[in-house]
């Protein structure tokens, strides 16, 4: 595994280039501001007078329509949601994607699964911070950065590495370290992590633990503290020190109980389910399902969101977060 740092990368490859960041959500804002503050020439491409138009202007950006930005830019960095990218690409970006330009992403979904097929003569790269946008910006402003990934799918100009690594440096990623990988590896591992562990697995584990305690007669408030609130403390220890030192920092009771009981929670069946989830990602079944969901205007997803918001743990959690000063009334 090759890791690149600031000293390994020069920004010179981008000094005479214009980078169009398409989208101004969490990542779009953070990445565009960081590159701008690194001295790079950045424009932001958005829907005319859309919700983010004024936000980007107020942040000091030159804001253009997506078509105008794509025409002007040497590098087009697409940071709108996965499900919108192909349609926007075909109608507003592709006509201006001339030979020698670079098409860039922060997630490989649409390239890996073939929803976007760039023309010949165009570099296709990926630069992905391994952190939410707010932390990408916060750590940059503090003089550091978050780790990131770079990938090269097509090197049409023989300068794709210089381009994508300089983008990573401009965003601040090489301050912490940038790993080179592939579109396939980034896409499939990212989807798996979200579904099986980080978003899907963890929330289901928390919910099951909370419900077990409440159903046994314990107060919802105590159940929330013990199964959800304190999770951050443990995750922070793992994040900073790894498993071994996390076990060292908790009590002997917690260490013994956790080590002797954990395999009864995440069982061989759980791992078999993870392998099936990974297969669905690898063979495209998940992608087809998600595309159909998007075509149905996210009806199932919206229903799941509503049900999730009605869970008892959400009501109790909101009350306790306000008590702790972590959440404010909207």
Swiss-Prot record:
What's the EC number here?
1.1.1.86
**Enzyme's top EC category:** oxidoreductase
**The protein's role, per its UniProt record:** Involved in the biosynthesis of branched-chain amino acids (BCAA). Catalyzes an alkyl-migration followed by a ketol-acid reduction of (S)-2-acetolactate (S2AL) to yield (R)-2,3-dihydroxy-isovalerate. In the isomerase reaction, S2AL is rearranged via a Mg-dependent methyl migration to produce 3-hydroxy-3-methyl-2-ketobutyrate (HMKB). In the reductase reaction, this 2-ketoacid undergoes a metal-dependent reduction by NADPH to yield (R)-2,3-dihydroxy-isovalerate.
Which residues bind Mg(2+) 2 per the record? 190, 226, 230
**What does the UniProt cofactor note say?**
Binds 2 magnesium ions per subunit.
Q: Which UniProt keywords apply?
A: Amino-acid biosynthesis, Branched-chain amino acid biosynthesis, Magnesium, Metal-binding, NADP, Oxidoreductase
A Gene Ontology biological process in which this protein takes part is:
isoleucine biosynthetic process
The pathway this protein participates in, as annotated, is: Amino-acid biosynthesis; L-isoleucine biosynthesis; L-isoleucine from 2-oxobutanoate: step 2/4; Amino-acid biosynthesis; L-valine biosynthesis; L-valine from pyruvate: step 2/4
Instruction: Name the chemical reaction catalysed here.
Output: (2R)-2,3-dihydroxy-3-methylbutanoate + NADP(+) = (2S)-2-acetolactate + NADPH + H(+); (2R,3R)-2,3-dihydroxy-3-methylpentanoate + NADP(+) = (S)-2-ethyl-2-hydroxy-3-oxobutanoate + NADPH + H(+)
The yes or no answer to whether the keyword Kinase is present is no
Sequence positions that bind NADP(+): 24-27, 47, 52, 82-85, 133
Q: Name one GO molecular function term.
A: NADP binding
Cofactor(s) of this protein? Mg(2+)
Protein family (similarity comment): Belongs to the ketol-acid reductoisomerase family.
For Mg(2+) 1, which residues are the binding ones?
190, 194
Glycoprotein as a keyword of this entry, yes or no, is: no
Q: What is this protein called?
A: Ketol-acid reductoisomerase (NADP(+))
**Protein source organism:** Methanococcus vannielii (strain ATCC 35089 / DSM 1224 / JCM 13029 / OCM 148 / SB)
- Residues forming the catalytic site: 107
Give the InterPro entries listed for this entry: 6-PGluconate_DH-like_C_sf, KARI, KARI_C, KARI_N, KARI_prok, NAD(P)-bd_dom_sf
Q: Which residues bind substrate?
A: 251
Q: Which domain of life is it from?
A: Archaea
Q: Which NCBIfam families match?
A: ilvC, PRK05479.1, PRK13403.1
Describe the location of the KARI C-terminal knotted domain by residue ranges: 182-327
KARI N-terminal Rossmann domain location: 1-181
């Amino acid at each position: 595994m090759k890791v690149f740092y600031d000293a390994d990368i020069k920004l010179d490859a981008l000094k005479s280039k214009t980078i169009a960041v398409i989208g101004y959500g969490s990542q779009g804002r953070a990445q565009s501001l960081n590159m701008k503050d690194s001295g790079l020439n950045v424009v932001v491409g958005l829907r005319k007078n859309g919700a983010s138009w004024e936000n980007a202007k107020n942040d000091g950006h030159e804001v253009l329509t997506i078509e105008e930005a794509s025409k002007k830019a040497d590098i087009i960095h697409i940071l709108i949601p996965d499900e919108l990218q192909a349609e926007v690409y075909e109608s507003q970006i592709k006509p201006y994607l001339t030979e020698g330009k670079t098409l860039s992403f922060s997630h490989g979904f649409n390239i890996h699964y073939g929803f976007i097929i760039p023309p010949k003569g165009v570099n296709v790269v990926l630069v992905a911070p391994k952190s939410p946008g707010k932390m990408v910006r916060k750590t940059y402003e503090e003089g550091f950065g978050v780790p990131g990934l770079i990938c090269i799918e097509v090197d049409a100009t023989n300068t794709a590495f210089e381009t994508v690594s300089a983008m990573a440096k401009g965003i601040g990623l090489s301050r912490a370290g940038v790993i080179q990988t592939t579109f396939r590896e980034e896409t499939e591992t990212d989807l798996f992590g979200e579904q099986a562990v980080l978003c899907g697995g963890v929330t289901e584990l928390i919910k099951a633990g909370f419900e077990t305690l409440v159903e046994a007669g314990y107060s919802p408030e105590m159940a929330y503290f013990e199964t959800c609130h304190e999770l951050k403390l443990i995750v922070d220890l793992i994040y900073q020190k790894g498993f071994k030192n996390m076990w060292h920092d908790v009590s002997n009771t917690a260490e013994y109980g956790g080590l002797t009981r954990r395999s009864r929670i995440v069982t061989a069946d759980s791992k078999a389910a993870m392998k099936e989830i990974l297969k669905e990602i690898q063979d495209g079944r998940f992608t087809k399902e998600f595309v159909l969901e998007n075509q149905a205007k996210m009806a199932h997803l919206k229903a799941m969101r509503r049900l999730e918001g009605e869970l008892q743990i959400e009501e109790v959690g909101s009350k306790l977060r306000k008590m702790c000063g972590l959440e404010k009334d909207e």
